Every structure is written in structure tokens, then in C-alpha cells.
Curated annotation (Swiss-Prot):
Belongs to the 'phage' integrase family. XerD subfamily. The active site is at R163, K187, H259, R262, H285, Y294. Residues 17-102 form the Core-binding (CB) domain. The keyword Cytoplasm applies. GO terms for biological process: cell division; chromosome segregation; DNA transposition. This is Tyrosine recombinase XerD. PANTHER family: PHAGE INTEGRASE-RELATED (PTHR30349), TYROSINE RECOMBINASE XERD (PTHR30349:SF90). One of its GO terms (cellular component) is cytoplasm. Keywords: Cell cycle, Cell division, Chromosome partition, Cytoplasm, DNA integration, DNA recombination, DNA-binding.
Amino acid sequence: MTQTKLSTQTTTDNNQEDNDVIIEQFLDSIWLEQGLSANTLSAYRLDLQALSQWLVTQKLNWLSVTTLDLHAFLATRLDEGYKATSAARLLSTLRRFFQYLYREKLRQDDPSALLSTPKLPKRLPKDLSEQQVENLLSAPCIDEPIELRDKAMLEVLYACGLRVSELVGLSLSDISLRQGVLRVIGKGDKERLVPLGEEAIYWLEQYLQYGRPALMQGKTDDIVFPSLRGQKMTRQTFWHRIKHYAVIAGIDSEKLSPHVLRHAFATHLLNHGADLRVVQMLLGHSDLSTTQIYTHVATERLKVLHQQHHPRG
């Protein structure tokens, strides 16, 4: 790979172009090494472009920026309303990028090594009770093709614990109704097989036979859940559909998130005695600690039930 040599001169428009080239070289490198998703690469690119533009205003460049400068940059992001989670992601991006510059001998040091991680509040995922999930899944009017599609999508989400991006990205070749499993391509293009369950299989069969043909309008694309125009549905569109059905189901908007059924899937499995590592595998988490947050949700629910029903609660 051809490397762009860093200049010690004050950043100019030409050096701004060099910055962009180096960013793309870095993204190519981590994509090849780790197989990151397009969404992750896009987030890295936006973070580094923001830093590059800030460096121009400070008359700095990749070679001259120091740890104190990076602290100042992070502070400006927080002042602009960055949430702690976004700041933590930005810090991760900076560390990876400057480690890359150091490894490739484009810098003699790593100014990100001494950066501190913002303290993140421990948030429990928003979850729904089993009755609330039942109300949500019952909200679509299955007489209409679009609502039959939505019914199938909601059932699959809850049955399989998918991310919304995984759901809208499903192809017909990913579904085996005979075997009762889905092939899911998750983060980092990692593949996993997830069982569907009887309800999801039934509603998928109904939708594929009666709903999908009307939405596809003769198109031969492999998309499982098309939009009204027969094209791939966006995550934002499905999020609007979830909010629509939540209103019908009488669910408080504070309880909602795009992954509300994924969270319910994990919590309800644990409530019914599922092993944590099995839930980790079904969710497609690479790290068990990511899954362990759901044990706190299950514990909190048990505390509430104890207080409500135990004579000394």
C-alpha cells in the first residue's frame, strides 16, 4: 500500500487532502484486518474527518497533534452535546487511528495512549413485559399485505432476537422454513444460525404466500421484507412502524427503542432459565460481558415481583 508522507508544516488545503488519503488508508487497513461492517467504517470516517477539520482550525496536523490537543478536541465534542457513548466511540476511533500511524512509522509516538475513557453510566436496556410484547405483536391488521409483512417482521424479531439491520437485510436464501432456522449475517459479517420457533414460522409462511407477492409487484429481488415500492426497507422505516404499533398496543414511548424486541428476547429467555452463553450465541455477541447486562434486567424484574407478591416484600 502506498503511504502518504506526513508534513511537519502547518496544515494547508493540500495537507487536508493528504489527511483524507491517510484516513482512507487507515480504513482500508482495519477493514482488511478485521472485516468491519460498512456502518462501523462510516462512523470511523466521520469521527476522523471531524478531527481533521478541527486540526485545520488549530493550525495542526496528524504529526504535530499532542495528547493535550486530543483532550481539547474531545472536550469540544462534549461541549457540542456529544453523549458519553458517542465520546467513548470517538476515543476508540482515535486510539485505533494513532496506533496505526505509529505502527506504520508515520509518527514516532502515539498521542492517544494517555487519553482517558469518559465514564459511562450503566444503563439497562429498555424492556417490555411478556404481556406488552404480546400486545405489540397483535397490533398489526393482518388483512393488509403491508401489515401482514409487519406482523411477520415483529414475530421474527422477537423469536430470533435480531438487530433491526439484520432483519431488514434478510434474503430468501437465508430462511429455511423446513429446518426452522435463519442464517443471519451480523456485525463484522459474522454468520450465525438462529431457530425460528412455531409462531414465527407460521407468520412467515402466511406472509410469503399472501403478503410479499403483493408488495414485490412482480419484481424478482431476493429481499424478504420489501418496502411499499418493492425495495429494501431502511432501519428508520421499520422503526417508524414499531412506534405506530406501540401506540395501538398502548405502550409508553419511554419503553421504546429500535431494538426493543431484541432486548425483550434476551430478557425473557433469561427469565425462563436460559443459559447466558446460549443467549450470547443467539444474539451474536462476541463478548459475554455485552450479554451480561440482560442478567441485571432479569434481576430487577425478579425484585419487583418479590416486592409485589411476597408477604414481607
